[in-house]
Amino acid sequence: MLTLLAILTVSYIIGSIPTSIMAGKMMKGIDIRNFGSGNAGGTNAFRVLGWKTGLTVTLIDIVKGVVAAVSVVAFFRHHPIGAFPDINEVALRLLAGMSAVIGHVFTVFAGFKGGKGVSTAAGMLIGIAPVSMLMVIGIFLLTVWFSRYVSVASIFAAVAFPLIIAIRKYVFELGGGLDYYIRLFGESFSFHDSLDYHLIIFGLLVAFAILFTHRANIRRLISGTENRVTFRKHA
């Protein structure tokens, strides 16, 4: 129990690192939550601080999720505080990753007002199912490129993840064929992709959570007032 508590606590602290807020202070001496959409995430960093800073913020937020789901769990597996928790490996990584996402959304370092957690959640899933997440990232990037709406891309990607896992597990894997080559591709890069059913359940919960946290964006999309991203450098 102490080991599980330590994993969740360390993951929460890592997730709580307020990347975009720190970037806003360093780059322009501002609190990014007072500009743009008012959100302390990578998307607003793109809008307010420019694409280079926005990309850096997004990548760091992704890394937070990877570290929580992979490195923190691995560390405490080798250095447990008492007995290591008897929990399914994928479920444990999901718990650690979600603790980081909660830290990102409710950061202890910035008055519990952080970002929406999309990038950190993506990082967690990259650490658990990298090949499936490559597909999701492809969907995300194509949607951003053609629509210029990060909110739409986030929603599409969130819905796509559990569908991809379910199709790979219950259609391609059972029937053989295509998923063998998908796995072979991943293993050629030392990617070990999980198709554990916990991921499908979690993916569905994340999809609903993303829809909930993007409800204001959805209202703006319907009214035609949602901000589009641009790829030009801001002054």
From Swiss-Prot:
Probably interacts with PlsX. This is Glycerol-3-phosphate acyltransferase. The keyword Transmembrane applies. Its main location: membrane. It comes from the Bacteria. GO terms for biological process: phospholipid biosynthetic process. Belongs to the PlsY family.
